[in-house]
Amino acid sequence: MSSRKTKSNAHAECLSQVQRILRERFCHHSPHSNLFGVQVQYKHLIELLKRTAIYGESNSVLIVGPRGSGKTTLLNHALKELMEIEVSENVIQVHLNGLLQTNEKIALKEITRQLNLDNVVEDKVFGSFAENLSFLLEALQKGDRTSSCPVIFILDEFDIFAHQKNQTLLYNLFDISQSAQTPVAVIGLTCRLDILELLEKRVKSRFSHRQIHLMNSFDFPQYLKIFKEQLSLPAEFPDKAFAERWNENVHCLSEDSTVLEVLQKHFSVNKNLQSLHMLLMLALNRVTVSHPFMTSADLMEAQHMCSLDSKANIVHGLSVLEICLIIAMKHLNDIYEEEPFNFQMVYNEFQKFIQRKAHSVYNFEKPVVMKAFEHLQQLELIKPVERTSVNSQREYQLVKLLLDNTQIMNALQKYSNCPTDVRQWATSSLSWL
């Protein structure tokens, strides 16, 4: 009995390690994971970083690609290789994010903190942002340009920095990358293909115009290979026998017709690796001690969860009155061909239905209907077409419905306890109204 319990504990510990290794691989932009289809871009980036770290050259580059294309993973791999070179032990990294550093003052404080120069700056007063930044970089100098401490500035959500007032941060970073004594590399990450159009002329003139594009250009056979590699356990996994069985199961999954159908469907909707990781994470969550190996059913259920319509799910939790208002808006969309409408128009449509079917739906007072309408707006199922003025009446504010007919009908099919007359109203032709 004791040996069986020990064996069970060892099995549970083994699965716990599997979960930890794979979740870390799926959830983090780990520099230890493999790069897929971006070897040329990686070579370009690492070469540029080495020129800054080893030879004291200043450079600037933008990494451009859609969300989930691997921009951060690519950069993390390059930085990891750079930090393994003995010459660049003293390279300093400064990470900024457009969502966090919303203006140049906040950005400057963050730069000072990451450079560990708070005690140097103390109560000094600077005339401008440029003067302050130059002072920080001078504090890092060790004589000539080649012996000074290189600084790598990484700007995530680069396009948000481009929308900041006067683009002061970008101007000064690109300026020092051309003229400063301290070697500086400025690396921007963005999903905007038109990023150069957002830059002011003075900023653009100081940018090197180097761009590295990531476009997820792999085909389905490569996607299938990535699927196998991402699910496989590494050779150094402690329990060799379990790792062998796990990897054999992954190989069988990659040849299963049901799994291939799931992956093909997922690939056709979204081929980025972030989306694949989400699918694999949901399937991995179903692996337990009693169910130690992933199956095609797990992947099918994960695919179903990935493809759920969030807006349609919100509709499942609405009241019958709110459902009636959405159906009224659906008919208005059909009549006026997607033109905006207001509350009064929706209320009139609802009243037409009530007059015909008073026995099945309670006739709510107008303020109650208005409250339900406002709740739909809070849930972002409808949105105002234009900004509301203080003097405008709420009943006549123009709005648009953010659900299409298919979403409404699918949601109604799954809506429990919906009155039959309401369902019939939703499917009725315009002539019925």
From Swiss-Prot:
Keyword set, alphabetical order: ATP-binding, DNA replication, DNA-binding, Methylation, Nucleotide-binding, Nucleus
Gene3D superfamilies tied to this protein: P-loop containing nucleotide triphosphate hydrolases
InterPro entries with a match to the protein in the record: AAA+_ATPase, AAA_16, ORC4, ORC4_C, P-loop_NTPase
Keyword Nucleotide-binding found: yes
Binding site residues for ATP: 65-72
Family note: Belongs to the ORC4 family.
Complex and partners: Component of ORC, a complex composed of at least 6 subunits: ORC1, ORC2, ORC3, ORC4, ORC5 and ORC6. ORC is regulated in a cell-cycle dependent manner. It is sequentially assembled at the exit from anaphase of mitosis and disassembled as cells enter S phase. Interacts with DBF4. Interacts with POLQ.
Record-given protein name: Origin recognition complex subunit 4
Gene: Orc4
